[in-house]
């Protein structure tokens, strides 16, 4: 092979590689747009708030168990879960054992959730062990 044929072969390989890269980029972009559209259509602001509240509630229970802010529950508190009303504006946090959840612990958990998540207190009502 002479040098001219080598240049043509290398040029074709480079062009195929470039075309493949553009095709891959187009497919990737279309996938990202589709996923983004799906998520924006199926998850609302309220869903994000509930997720944030759940994470903050778990952290608040861990902090309460560690004696944070002078809280002494005398037992290990267990985060039991979260539920919400149909309109997702009333959020309920379940912690056990219920008999050891004092008003001080409830207030700490609710205050911690509002402070960390920065959600509007007049829009969302958080209750511990309803």
From Swiss-Prot:
Record flagged with keyword Secreted: yes
Intervals of motif QXSXEXXXL: 15-23
Propiece residue ranges: 1-14
Pfam families: Class_IIIsignal
Post-translational modification: The N-terminus is cleaved by the prepilin peptidase EppA, which recognizes the class III signal sequence.
Comment text on domains: Contains an amino terminal motif QXSXEXXXL, which is part of a class III signal sequence.
Name of the featured protein: Probable pilin MJ0835.1
InterPro entries in UniProt: Class3_signal_pept_motif
Keyword Calcium recorded: no
Localization: Secreted; Cell surface; Fimbrium
Keywords attached to this entry: Fimbrium, Secreted
GO cellular component, as recorded: cell surface; extracellular region; membrane
């Amino acid at each position: 092979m002479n040098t001219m044929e080598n240049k043509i072969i290398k040029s074709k390989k480079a062009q195929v590689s470039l075309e493949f890269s553009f095709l891959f980029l187009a497919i990737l972009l279309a996938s990202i747009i589709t996923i983004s559209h799906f998520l924006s259509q199926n998850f609302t602001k309220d869903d994000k708030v509930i997720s944030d509240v759940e994470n903050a509630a778990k952290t608040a229970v861990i902090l309460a168990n560690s004696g944070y802010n002078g809280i002494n529950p005398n037992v290990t508190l267990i985060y039991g879960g979260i539920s919400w009303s149909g309109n997702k504006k009333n959020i309920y946090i379940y912690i056990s054992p219920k008999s050891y959840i004092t008003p001080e612990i409830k207030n700490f958990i609710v205050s911690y959730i509002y402070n960390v998540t920065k959600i509007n207190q007049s829009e969302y009502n958080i209750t511990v062990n309803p």
